[in-house]
Structure formats: structure tokens, C-alpha cells
Amino acid sequence: MAAAAAAGAGPEMVRGQVFDVGPRYTNLSYIGEGAYGMVCSAYDNVNKVRVAIKKISPFEHQTYCQRTLREIKILLRFRHENIIGINDIIRAPTIEQMKDVYIVQDLMETDLYKLLKTQHLSNDHICYFLYQILRGLKYIHSANVLHRDLKPSNLLLNTTCDLKICDFGLARVADPDHDHTGFLTEYVATRWYRAPEIMLNSKGYTKSIDIWSVGCILAEMLSNRPIFPGKHYLDQLNHILGILGSPSQEDLNCIINLKARNYLLSLPHKNKVPWNRLFPNADSKALDLLDKMLTFNPHKRIEVEQALAHPYLEQYYDPSDEPIAEAPFKFDMELDDLPKEKLKELIFEETARFQPGYRS
């Protein structure tokens, strides 16, 4: 834990890192770190609560700039109880001085990944967590956004079992017609939660990839272990087919990539493993919904509104309290091709509203 900075004593240090967030945020305490930044909790002297502050230093890398800009653009436009918001952003007053960006968010005690390492969940908890994931996802999908990296560590939890989806750095506007060349190379989302079509096709992607990830998360809540822990690309596919069985001819016809289709045709026939054999203690309604989410063919996979209306979630289902976005989200430009200098300018502009004396 960093010592509390005395008023006016300059930035606090946390594990050798400068955290320049005073005077409003003090009493910093280390939480963890990701690929390009550290997260601390801090005391907000204005709202009198502890908050989470993520320090991001992305400006050396085009990919990190892209992810940072995506996350900020999306989260500043989203407003939903099951999606983490941005409360404040701290950065230098000029673009030349801006080396880091500090993002202030609600402090959540833990995440689903940490929880599943230590606790076996009751059916009631599984049901409530799944409902909140789908409630947040309904809003995301209504904005025409794909999260693309749903996994237990991106689901934040607090002691009252509130759940918030975080990390929109890989999110995209849904565009089933656009052929994202190089899709697989830039697709760094965790393999275990990846839909089979991501490994088999490169053309376009749809909201059904997020539903697949939610199915993987439900299976993990039922058993405290990942359902498809593939060691590499082909191993991942083999794990999936080992449980779902061989795809039907109709399902194979959806695979545009001939090499991928021929690979699947070359494999020995596998039978589907019954879900109640894998999860003998699970609620039968939970397994019915799991089956509809972990469907090989993305066109037959359940959609988020149908999933919310499934009998497993009937005690929570309330369409009048499951809000959607006001308007579909649009990125003005494809960020993939922009140089990091341009992305830095866009991050600077996007964060201006939090600067003292800002006038829109």
C-alpha cells in the first residue's frame, strides 16, 4: 500500500510507478496490472468513496492506442447498470505532455475469474450472474457493438453480487458484411471463450460470437473449470467437437473457408456428449439454455433477447427493466489503419471533457 500523499506533496508512487492523480484522489492501494497499465484503488475526496484507477501508458504502440481509444469512446457513450462506466479521466493539459491516461471507475471487490478459483456457486448465484451478463449484453448488442472478449476476468463483482462487464478494448461495431482481413492475426481474445466460426472463417462476425462466450462462462460457473481449455488453435476446435459432436452437413455448409471445411470433413465422426453427463448436478433449465448458447452453427445460436426470456431466468426476466441503447454506435473511421500519432490526438480530444474549465 502506498503511503497517503500529504496535501501538495506531488504524485504518489505505487510499486515504483508514478500515479499522478492528486489532489482529488489519494490513499492509493495496488490492485493489479494488465498488459499496459496498473490498477489501484484510491480515495475520492470529492465523492467520499474509494474508486478504481487504471493507469494506461499506450502511446508507444499502435495496438494499445487503438484499444484505449475504443474503450474510452464506447464506455463514455454507454450507460447501463451492468456495464462499468467511466467516472473521470485524468491526463496532462497538453498533448505533448500526455504520456499516461488515468481512467477512474467504480471500485468492484472482485471478478468472476477470482471468485470461481475459490468458491463453488449455488444455482441461485449462477442464475443471477447469468441474468446480469445477458442484461448488459442486450444493451451492448442493441448499440450494434460486439464485445468480443467476454470471459470471467472481464466480469466485475461486488459483495452485493452486482455484476458489471468491463474491458471493451477489443470491441467492434457489428459488421457481418465487412471482410476484416487479418482478423485472426489481430484477434487476441482469450482462445477458450472463442466461437468456432472465428477459427473457421475470417469473413465478418456477428453478435452470436458473444453468446458463445457467455455459454462458455455459464459452463464454467457450473463446474469451476473452463469447458474448452484448448492449448492452441486446432486443439481448441477438437475440444469443442469432442463435446458438441461432429457438425451436420448443414452446419458445414455455413463454413465459407474450404480449407477449414475440408479439415472438419477429414475428422472421424464424434457423438455429442449429453450435458447432464458433463454437469450431473446442474439445473435442467440451465443445461437447456447452455445447449442453445453453445450451438456450433452461429445462425442457430440463441440471441440475447431470447436467452433473457428463457425459463431458467424467469424469476428475473423483465423486458421493461432491460434497457437498450438510445442509438446504434458508430465509429467515424476504422481505427485499425491509423498511425499511433493520430490515435493519440483522438484520445486527447475524447478525454477533453474531463479537463478543468472544459467548454463543449
Swiss-Prot record:
This is Mitogen-activated protein kinase 1. ATP binds at I31, G32, E33, G34, A35, Y36, G37, M38, V39, K54. It catalyses: L-seryl-[protein] + ATP = O-phospho-L-seryl-[protein] + ADP + H(+); L-threonyl-[protein] + ATP = O-phospho-L-threonyl-[protein] + ADP + H(+). Its cofactor is Mg(2+). The modification Phosphoserine is found at S29, S246, S248, S284. Serine/threonine kinase which acts as an essential component of the MAP kinase signal transduction pathway. MAPK1/ERK2 and MAPK3/ERK1 are the 2 MAPKs which play an important role in the MAPK/ERK cascade. They participate also in a signaling cascade initiated by activated KIT and KITLG/SCF. Depending on the cellular context, the MAPK/ERK cascade mediates diverse biological functions such as cell growth, adhesion, survival and differentiation through the regulation of transcription, translation, cytoskeletal rearrangements. It comes from Homo sapiens. Residues 25-313 form the Protein kinase domain.
